[in-house]
A protein has these predicted regions:
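Acidic, glycine-enriched catalytic cores built around paired aspartates
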Residues: 1-158
């Protein structure tokens, strides 16, 4: 028996599809990458990771059989202390309590990403979570690299 299920994941197409789409009401400029799944448009999550979770929880997540892809990026410096790691664990527990199960995280510094873009020969082992899959950062097309860099770099001061 075949069945169609709803999904918001645009795993490999959010960058090329964005090149064909005009501006959107969320502030995304024409020809820029679309958001990945239910993730905020790059740079628009200005109120922190807890606010993102509370927004995503308002979606009918239980009706999306294929899951709701949520990408978030955190600063490595915000994960160094036992207290900050405890806050990150609390954020994960909150996500589960809210019914959000398909979370993906990059713990990457913007400075490192910019340096990898400028000097790819030095970063062959830099792996990133793209949208449903991992890839070597330097192997991605420049627009995909920019989209990952444009994701807000969060702390865990929830």
């Amino acid at each position: 028996i075949s069945a169609y299920t709803m999904s918001t994941s645009n795993i490999t197409s959010y960058v090329p599809n964005g090149m064909e789409v005009g501006s959107t009401p969320d502030g995304r400029s024409a020809k820029s990458p679309l958001n990945e799944g239910c993730s905020p448009t790059q740079g628009s999550d200005t109120c922190g990771p807890t606010a993102v979770l509370l927004s995503v929880a308002k979606l009918p997540n239980e009706k999306v059989a294929a899951g709701q892809l949520l990408n978030m990026r955190f600063s490595p410096s915000s994960m160094k202390s036992p207290e900050s790691l405890a806050k990150f664990k609390a954020l994960l527990r909150t996500s589960v309590r809210l019914g959000i199960y398909h979370n993906q995280f990059n713990v990457l510094d913007s400075k490192v990403l910019r340096d990898a873009m400028a000097h790819p020969e030095n970063y062959g082992d830099l792996m990133v979570r793209v949208a449903g899959y991992c890839a070597q950062f330097v192997s991605l097309m420049p627009q995909a690299q920019e989209a990952i860099l444009a994701r807000s770099e969060n702390g865990v001061s929830v």
